[in-house]
């Protein structure tokens, strides 16, 4: 992918920052999605996908009015057709600013205040609807919508994705491309109507700091043509030194496969490992019915992939 201009991207990324301890929404920074979509020939008013960006934060804390700290997990989601994304370091600084802020008499009041403020601030920043939920005592929650590990299953058919590096002979394959190279992808006739692939070898780098981001990628393809799985793995590995945000990586994978295969249905989901207490999980699909409802549902927290 093309190198993008980062000169105006953030007042925080790549710089030393003081950690504010009191609630400060001015810390939040947004980035237009168009800065990456243009070179992928994606138009905001005619996207070939639907989906969402899901964020999970594991170290969010604030104080009660008598000074007692409470900790919670925060999950929030917003749609991929929003004009902006939130820049990750600014988000981490923003949620850290709750840490010494007194927000209520009880745990419930504290968490409700975090939810209310974060929904308002993020929705205004991104000019879209952001849904925020807070969770505590996760291991005591009995809801079947919570703490379920189903990422490697197609929700409708309950069929597993095939982990490419564990299934196909790759010992003699030479991997030497570490910048995104869609020419690696090879089209083959589909022997079965649906192909489901997974790899735990996704790695990319932050667009500004070049810090590494590792994750799992899941690909669902339905159509007369599919992609050779080893070539798909080669392509996934080629992101290893690619400097782009998580959302941009997911959209690049989706767009390359969409253009190449012209499938009936396509879904790409990237579950990145947490860094700085947060993980980012973008998903793009050709129709809403293909989306993992649990991922885009802010009220549902799942057991993660091992690295998350």
Describe the predicted segments one by one:
Residues 1-308:
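N-terminal intrinsically disordered, cationic/polar leader segments
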């Amino acid at each position: 992918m093309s190198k993008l201009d980062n000169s105006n991207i953030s007042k925080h990324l790549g710089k030393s920052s003081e950690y504010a301890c009191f609630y400060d929404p001015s810390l939040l920074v947004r980035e237009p999605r168009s800065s990456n979509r243009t070179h992928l020939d994606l138009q905001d008013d005619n996207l070939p996908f639907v989906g969402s960006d899901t964020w999970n934060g594991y170290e969010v804390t604030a104080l009660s009015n008598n000074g007692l700290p409470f900790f919670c997990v925060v999950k929030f989601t917003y749609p991929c057709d929003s004009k902006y994304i939130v820049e990750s370091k600014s988000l981490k600084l923003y949620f850290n600013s709750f840490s010494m802020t007194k927000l209520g008499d009880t745990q419930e009041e504290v968490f409700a205040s975090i939810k209310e403020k974060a929904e308002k601030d993020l929705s205004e920043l991104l000019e879209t609807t952001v849904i925020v939920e807070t969770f505590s005592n996760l291991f005591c929650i009995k809801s079947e919508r919570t703490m379920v590990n189903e990422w490697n299953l197609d929700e409708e058919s309950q069929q597993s994705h095939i982990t490419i590096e564990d299934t196909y002979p790759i010992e003699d394959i030479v991997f030497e491309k570490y910048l995104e190279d869609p020419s690696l992808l090879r089209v083959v006739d589909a022997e079965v109507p649906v192909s489901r692939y997974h790899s735990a070898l996704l790695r990319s780098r932050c667009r500004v700091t070049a810090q590494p981001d590792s994750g799992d990628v899941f690909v669902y393809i339905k159509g007369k043509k599919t992609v050779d799985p080893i070539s798909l793995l080669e392509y996934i590995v080629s992101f290893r030194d690619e400097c782009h945000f998580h959302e941009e990586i997911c959209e690049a994978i989706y767009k390359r496969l969409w253009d190449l295969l012209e499938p009936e249905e396509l879904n790409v989901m990237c579950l990145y490992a947490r860094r700085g207490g947060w993980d980012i999980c973008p998903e793009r699909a050709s129709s809403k019915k293909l989306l993992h409802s649990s991922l885009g549902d802010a009220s549902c927290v799942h057991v993660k992939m091992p690295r998350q």
